[in-house]
Amino acid sequence: MNNMKKLWALLLALAMTFSLAACGGSSDEEAATVDQTTEEEVPGDTAPESDLAYVQDKGTLVIGITEFEPMDYQDADGNWIGFDADMAAAFAESLGVTPEFQIIDWDNKVMELDGKTIDVVWNGMTLTDEVTSAMDCSNAYCNNAQIVILPADVADQYPDAASMADLTFAVESGSAGQEQAEANGFTYTEVVDQATAVLEVASGTADAAIIDSLMAAAMVGEGTSYDQLTYTIELNSEEYGVGFRQGSDLVDLLNQFFVDSYADGTLMEIAETYGVQAAIIPQE
């Protein structure tokens, strides 16, 4: 009897041993399977989100602008017009979406772009190192310069930058005009946009302003609302481009749009409408 009990005990012990081994093997296999599955499911570097797909999905191209005649400004009915506005609208149409113009704080343009408050900065934007390092930009499409605005009755007293050392300037915050004020050691006050900078000079709050030459030609002098002002010396030469989010697939599409619209005459026709044809850079 005792022998039978011992035999049964031995058989039971062996059965438990095999059972545990089987369970252990199963766990190891499952762990290996999980590890293998995990490795297989880890994706590689994903491509950046397509801006084209993004704007087409929502149906709008939101264009960041400021009030900047002759590039972006409103007509009597409140519609946005200007060389940049018309080109932006045509580009949006080529994508099959609706253009939507959004006034921005120029100093925050990169933040607005990256935060997707806007999809593009298209507003006579100078291609500075700061801009091109923070955005992916189109090819240059327009020549420009930063130019000094003064009251016409004192302009002859300031023939060069050195003679302007004691003046107080108004400049758009974050603009190429501000860069030139700093580069020349001028005393300046930052304002919200270039139109306000001109207004500061007209009202006597500032002695002078630094704005884009294209805007100066449209806003200042005989036949304008600021016929008591004039523009004088150029402080630099520069080029305009259009800014997108880094990695955006819209950049190449816009460059091709520029080439096509230049070739078929559309670009120059729009430029002539707003008197900027002499500043256009050929798109080829």
State each model region's role.
Residues 19-34:
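Bacterial lipoprotein signal-peptidase II cleavage site
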Residues 23, 52, 83-84, 132-142, ...:
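A structural signal for short loop-to-beta-strand junctions that line the ligand-binding cleft
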Residues 35, 39-40, 85-94, 173-175, ...:
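Extended ligand-binding regions for polar small-molecule ligands
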Residues 35, 43-124:
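Extracytoplasmic small-molecule ligand-binding "clamshell" domains
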Residues 83, 101-112, 156, 173-176, ...:
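Short helix-initiation/N-cap motifs at beta->coil->alpha
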Residues 93-94, 102-103, 107-120, 134-136, ...:
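Short helices/loops that flank or line small-molecule/ion binding pockets
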Residues 143-150, 213, 217-259, 277-284:
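Periplasmic-binding protein-like
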Residues 150-168:
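Flexible hinge/capping segments at coil-to-helix
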